[in-house]
Amino acid sequence: MNQTELLESLKCASEGMVKAMTSTTMKLNFVFIATVIFLSFYFAGLAIQALLRNNIFSNSTRHILIVCLLNSIVHQAVTLETRIHQVYRSFVYSSEPCRLLFHFTECEVELYFYYLTNYFSTYAVFSLTFDRLVSHYKPKYYFSHQYYVSNSLLIIQLLLSLSTYYVGLYGVPLVGYAPICYYTPRLAVNFSKINDFRTATMVFCIIVTIFIYYLSVKSEKQIHRTSYSPGERYIACENVATSQSVCILIVLQFACIMLSSFGVNYIRARESLMSEENFNKIAPFFPGVTYASLCLPLVIYFKTKLTIRNRKLRIGVMTSMYGDVGDHMNRLKKSWE
């Protein structure tokens, strides 16, 4: 019996798999993941409103963030749909182990959208990093060609996602069965290489973004010492704020993806030391991009609220001061030092 025939013969769930898929732990996991997803929908709406009405980012960065938010909504919707199907089967077919699992051909559409949006979400760090890179080193070009920059980066991000999907899933036979439709097809052999490449990309982007943030802070301090031009000071301040936000986003994205990657790899390495039931109870708690898709709108929304509040406080302090123009300018100079 070859590998394909062996996988096709495993139609019925084992006793451990049945216990895991119909357990209270699995149902609680569904409630937890569904809560994360609905919170991400809510905050994605708030974040998009903030970007459209109270934008604190450059137009290029805003464009990238809006596209990434829309992608995260699609990803979360697909994840929720797969989990609803799984929990439905756990109730309806709890006593029929041969109908509990999904054949991978039933999951073809979910796999396509789940992994494509997953990769697009991961490579958002590339677009955001190079957006900051161009902004810092070519500011005049950046501010006069913002939509060209963002569209170019988004196209590269999409090409990276499609290429990764092609290497990982394209042409892989959809044979065998899975308890949840976003599980990796059994004959997909390049996933470890893909995870290594994604990890290397994110580490590189974190290093570059932290470096750009350091340069932005250094540049802002220098401008504050040498220039009283409101325009220069504003641009420098906005560069620091945006670089800081992007840095936070990338670090959180990395943390969520690594939680998923290392978490699943860790329990897989110890799969022989634990029962099949326990393994399948723990694995669904590690959908890293699901958590990252909640972190993205949270950072955008609360960073926007915080920045607006700080601006109002600063304006309130400046407008509440009394004295002649000379006194006012002296106070401004002192506050900018």
Swiss-Prot record:
TM regions (residue ranges): 28-48, 110-130, 155-175, 197-217, 247-267, 282-302
Record keywords: Membrane, Transmembrane, Transmembrane helix
MF GO annotations: G protein-coupled receptor activity
Example GO BP: sensory perception of chemical stimulus
Family annotation (InterPro entries): 7TM_GPCR_serpentine_rcpt_Sra
Domain of life where this protein originates: Eukaryota
GO CC term (a single one): membrane
Location within or outside the cell: Membrane
Membrane protein topology class: Multi-pass membrane protein
Keyword Transmembrane helix in record: yes
One Pfam family from the record: 7TM_GPCR_Sra
Keyword Transmembrane helix annotated: yes
Family: Belongs to the nematode receptor-like protein sra family.
PANTHER family from the UniProt entry: G-PROTEIN COUPLED RECEPTORS FAMILY 1 PROFILE DOMAIN-CONTAINING PROTEIN-RELATED, SERPENTINE RECEPTOR, CLASS A (ALPHA)-RELATED-RELATED
Name recorded for this polypeptide: Serpentine receptor class alpha-17
Organism: Caenorhabditis elegans
Gene behind this protein: sra-17
